[in-house]
Amino acid sequence: MNSHELRFAFGNPVLYAQIRRVMQKRLTYLSRATLIDLCNAIQAVERQQVKGMILEAGCALGGSAIILALAKQSQRPFSLFDVFGQIPPPSPQDGPDVHERYREIQSGNATGINGDDYYGYVTHLEDIVIANMSRFGININTNAIQIVKGLYQDTMHIDQPVAFAHIDCDWYESVLTCLTQIVPHLSIGGCLVIDDYEAWSGCRKAVDEFFAMRRDSFRFVMKSNLHIVRVAK
């Protein structure tokens, strides 16, 4: 356990125990450090009383959504966007790494965490996510959680301020759609976490292109993943 994790564990023993439990139950692909960083970002938003909703784009089995739901104030709206099925194909804007990964998924040979079934092959995935949240004592109604199923370009229509967004959707077009829809509504002090900036070429390209002419309004911090905080409108 490094010093960063140790500080979090001592300061947030209940949340830390839940992070360990989420990982033990193989509900997330994220590292422990990444989940801790997500918690710290949510706690900063709550501490600073940043206005707006929380959202996650791409929730897989719901592991990170569980941690975000536990870290936020129960009354703050939280929307989970996902196709809740097999990921859509990449575009020509994505690099060879992305297309190779998609071929593996499409072939039926992708595997999940520690050899489990790959979540993209599972039917009724949204029901599994809701059930996983329930196992951690999270009721989606009393915790102001909304499940939004479908392609982001069809479903992501933001009409309120955003305090925090976890963007975990891999490919160029998906990431660019999320940024285009979310960033105009991101409050000052609000935070974006880009999960796949270093993992997939298309994600990195979408982020770099989108923020190329907007950098002065944001602070970019590379933690376990890329965190982007709005500092000005």
Predicted segment positions?
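S-adenosylmethionine/decaboxylated-SAM
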Residues: 4-32, 47-233
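Conserved alpha-helix/loop element of class I SAM-dependent methyltransferases that forms part
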Residues: 36-50
